[in-house]
Curated annotation (Swiss-Prot):
Cell compartment(s), UniProt: Cell membrane
Source organism, top-level taxon: Bacteria
Function: Joins adenosylcobinamide-GDP and alpha-ribazole to generate adenosylcobalamin (Ado-cobalamin). Also synthesizes adenosylcobalamin 5'-phosphate from adenosylcobinamide-GDP and alpha-ribazole 5'-phosphate.
Family label: Belongs to the CobS family.
Essential cofactor(s): Mg(2+)
Pathway linked to the protein: Cofactor biosynthesis; adenosylcobalamin biosynthesis; adenosylcobalamin from cob(II)yrinate a,c-diamide: step 7/7
Organism of origin: Deinococcus radiodurans (strain ATCC 13939 / DSM 20539 / JCM 16871 / CCUG 27074 / LMG 4051 / NBRC 15346 / NCIMB 9279 / VKM B-1422 / R1)
Protein name: Adenosylcobinamide-GDP ribazoletransferase
Any Pfam family hit: CobS
Length: 269
């Protein structure tokens, strides 16, 4: 399995959550700030303090803030394109790929590779779930990972609007909540299972500024359609549920679809 950057240290405490204090509004603000912190620490490599005392339900609450992690990742890559660095387009695109992978700790890319090995295997759903836990990278994962990197590199070097990476990163982390909420968890003990049942409406509000950029709403529809189809196929291959690795796969698929939308000039409206 492709080794991502070390994940943030989180300790899930199964003990009951503490009772709300006498000032419920202040307590809720603290819980929401913790959810934001957890989302940024889990989905990015930003230099943030470790999240401590993670309670059951915190990951589900944090999923509403996934689009904000997209602003951090996509915004920095968009900044690289906006600066118009005096380097060949291929070099700038390679720097963009490296920055994208570095800011995510290769978390979603790792899920893409693991999912490809499992989903393309001619095995039973139970055996595919076992493959997801295998630490080795197979031919399907290697080929899919290389193809995804080539697509990302080609699209970033295709003269995209500078804001395209920002839209891609934000939209991908919004639309992934749809299959996360629609399908059961393939493995109940995983972090992916604990991230389900997120607040779609709040995530949409956070993504709204990005959706107001030129043609972003249409790109989001393309990404949502693609993610819906891939999620349905993956769920059938895994016996009806999805895993955290598949969530990573869906984020990468959505990002590439949005970048492809801008790269191929599908902006008629």
């Amino acid at each position: 399995m492709v080794q991502p950057s070390p994940a943030p240290v989180v300790t899930i405490t199964p003990a009951p959550a503490p009772a709300a204090p006498s000032h419920p509004h202040g307590w809720k603000r603290k819980q929401e700030f913790k959810a934001l912190h957890l989302a940024l620490a889990f989905l990015t490599t930003l230099p943030l303090p470790h999240v401590r005392d993670v309670q059951p339900g915190d990951f589900a609450r944090a999923s509403a803030y996934y689009p904000l992690a997209g602003y951090a990742v996509g915004g920095l890559v968009a900044g690289l394109l906006y600066l118009n660095v005096p380097l060949p387009p291929g070099v700038v695109a390679a720097l963009g790929v490296g920055l994208w992978l570095g800011l995510t700790g290769m978390l979603h890319f790792d899920g893409l590779v693991d999912s490809a090995d499992a989903l393309f295997a001619m095995k039973s759903p139970e055996q595919r779930l076992d493959i997801l836990k295998d630490v080795h990278v197979g031919a399907f994962g290697l080929a899919t990972g290389v193809l995804a990197l080539l697509l990302l590199w080609s699209l970033l070097g295709a003269g995209l609007p500078w804001y395209a990476p920002l839209v891609a990163a934000v939209v991908a982390r919004m639309v992934v909540l749809m299959p996360m909420n629609a399908y059961p968890a393939a493995r109940q003990e995983s972090l992916g299972a604990q991230s389900r049942q997120g607040r779609w409406g709040l995530a949409f509000l956070f993504a709204l500024p990005a959706l107001l950029l030129p043609h972003a709403w249409l790109a989001a529809l393309v990404a949502l359609l693609g993610v819906t189809l891939v999620a349905a196929w993956a769920a059938r291959r895994l016996g009806g549920g999805l895993s955290g690795d598949v969530y990573g796969l869906l984020i990468v698929v959505a990002e590439l679809l949005v970048l492809g939308f801008y790269g191929w000039g599908f902006t008629p409206l």
